[in-house]
Amino acid sequence: FSDLTKFIVSEDENVQNSFNSLVKAADKTIESVEVNGSDIAFISYTSGTTGTPKGAIHHHAWGYAHIRTTAKSWLGVRSEDIVWATAAPGWQKWIWSPFLAALGSGATAFVYKGKFEATTYLRLIEKHAINVLCCTPTEYRMMIKCDAFGTFEYPHLRSAVSAGEPLNREVI
């Protein structure tokens, strides 16, 4: 790897390659590429709940239709919202919610890289004023069973949806 160019990007303005200085120096011209509705836009993977995860190919027309229908009608995303879908990139659910629905609606997609821990999730929902939450039913069950559930307040949370497995009536 000795012939590779290596550099470090940092938020620290005092280093040679700070993120902000690289963005400011970058070419502002974007060369667009013509695509058709039938061209492949995404390849993501199903959760594997009912078997081995499967690659799912989606076309540009699907992504557009998703933004136009699901963001508004299923998640209830508004442009001023903070949306947290806990699925990891690469999984089908991540494409649906934080990527297409949130960003395609002009909302903010909240990202948390840590492991699931019920109290941490509840604290983040409160602290970051999450408006739209999409978790797996297992995550919801664990949060509701958490002793700290009632100690947090969720006045901003307007929509909570799930995907990936059945959601039992007790959680709802």
Outline where the language-model segments fall:
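ANL superfamily adenylate-forming
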Residues: F1-G37
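A short helix->loop->beta-strand "cap" motif at the edges of active sites that frequently abuts
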Residues: F1-T5, A107, P155-R158
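Adenylate-forming
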Residues: E11-E13, A87, G114-F116, I130-I172
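Short acidic capping loops at alpha-helix termini that bridge into adjacent secondary structure
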Residues: S38-D39, R78-I82, P155-H156
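Conserved S/T- and glycine-rich ATP-binding loop of Class I adenylate-forming
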Residues: I40, T46-T49, V83, I125, ...
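Conserved AMP-binding A3 loop
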Residues: A41-R68
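Conserved G/P- and acidic residue-centered "switch" motifs that form tight phosphate/ATP-binding loops
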Residues: T49, G106, G164
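Conserved AMP-binding/adenylation subdomain of ANL enzymes
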Residues: Y64-A85, P89-V132, K145-C146
